[in-house]
């Protein structure tokens, strides 16, 4: 506070506000914040004038934070009232002023009387309705600002302070201690001053960031001239394909954009190598899309997969269904199929080859036997015929043309024989008696087979007419003689 003692707070320039000017990182990630307000509670650490102090807790595991400087000093430098970092870029004042070539070190007085007069003039212009804007918002950011600016909040700096009793080994609170039980880091960053941060002089954090910016270089183009793809990493749900296209289209014509959401990356392919080199040079270390900093590097060509052994390809057999292990091993051990003469195409496969074969379809499985000798003989004949050539067509259907010899199965399993023999002229009468057909609804029954109709024995049939004729002849002779 000034050396003069005034009873009028408004005339003295004491600050009274309703809400602080703070950055998003200091406010915290919790949208519901309980904040306390104390008018004229502390004096500003820059101008030493009393101001309204706000105090809140930005998170569950964070420490309580409060405003350190008044809003007048905050507006002069466009910084946060708590961390004294730039409100727009999140950088220290020294880094921002160096990158934008701004010299404000001599514009703010340092003596008590001059500081008070300077602050009163600034407050008077604000009350008069003048739109007082600093030159920070009118200057466009350059490459250094884009490389170093913070695009997302950094809540880690809201953690609790280190417990001093733990450092000496005397803390008895254990897990209930509200401070961190860690050893402090020693170095230049541990020696920070709030006034040096505000004026931008000898700030160790700013010197570290400026040194990091000088070490950043451009991307080196690969020697392979066929590479025209750029890798973009660090994507999130807010970055869409159209946003990436708008950012890269200004440097050349784009051939394709491939986004891998599960890996949070994208690949941008240009039609020419010159467009890819121009984009890599202009956007290296300064690619920001929708407020998200992205990583940009050259894409690597995909390594071709090693070819499989040719012997394994020839020995592999595709199965349309589940086959027994013995059958699979037998098929895999068979030699490759023979080529046809004169390079003819292979013959067509039979229609039942694509049908899946299951172990339960084998009639000889689980000890099944034939019902009769005749059916067994006919089944064995049909089995031999099917194994030698192919299945006989149904009755009345014959192939029209056979341009090729009987097909060879080419290392595949022969088709399974039919459980029942097909119908043809040479079928036995026993099959008709063993497998009668039931008439369906609305169909007329078939007439019985001539061989199946029951008839009397031949002797009885021929004896009946002969006996009756003999009796009639004897009767005729007796009648004649009597007459």
UniProtKB/Swiss-Prot annotation:
Residues 336-351, 438-459 have a biased composition (Pro residues). Residues 381-391 have a biased composition (Polar residues). It holds the Pfam family STL11_N. Disulfide bonds: none annotated. A zinc finger (C3H1-type) spans 157-184. InterPro entries: Cwc2/Slt11 (IPR039171), Nucleotide-bd_a/b_plait_sf (IPR012677), RBD_domain_sf (IPR035979), RRM_dom (IPR000504), STL11/RBM22-like_N (IPR048995), Torus (IPR032297), Znf_CCCH (IPR000571), Znf_CCCH_sf (IPR036855). The keyword Zinc applies. GO terms for molecular function: DNA binding; mRNA binding; zinc ion binding. Residues 298-317, 336-483 are annotated as: Disordered. It comes from the Eukaryota. SMART domains: RRM, ZnF_C3H1. The keyword Signal does not apply. Residues 370-380, 392-401, 409-423, 460-476 have a biased composition (Low complexity). Residues 228-301 form the RRM domain. PROSITE patterns: RRM, ZF_C3H1. This is Zinc finger CCCH domain-containing protein 25. It comes from Arabidopsis thaliana (Mouse-ear cress).
